Amino acid sequence: ILFGIVSYSHALEVGDKAPDFNLQSTDGNKYQLSDVLEKEAVVLAWFPFAGTKGCTIECKSLAQNGHLLKDIAATYFMASVDPIEDNQVFAEENNADFPLLSDPTKQTAKDYDVLSLGWYAKRHTFYIGKNGVILYIDRDVRPETSAEDMAKKLIDLGIPKRTESSDLRMANPYSS
């Protein structure tokens, strides 16, 4: 009799509830997904390592073209399993004007099923609706056009534009 290896890890899919998290950010704040979702949708862009080529290209895309996302009612984060200190240096070097989240325990990466080989995150981007449900998972991220692709996908998913009456964080979209 042959026995198969059973994996108890559940790969997240569109329609699943996004796992909550509470992670330290490069802007000095901690972000809890459930708190941010009270205000608007969330884009969580996992990246393998701060300072590596593809990750630098992706971060620069978001830093240089983030204006494409500012009018859409969504908060976006990059996230990795790097220590916060590494992500802070990485954010400063790339002029990131958005939060980079650190998951040094790797628990959130495991919850999102992005932990590869047990030590780095896969480059996957999760689009999460205000109701906490995963709307889309991009498992083929193009670092060079990350900002443009995010903006297009958010619009395609029907995420509304920001309005003064509905945006509670218009002056600083990343303050909590």
Task: Locate the predicted segments by residue.
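Short acidic-hydrophobic, aromatic-tinged amphipathic segments that line or gate anion-handling sites
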Residues: 99-103
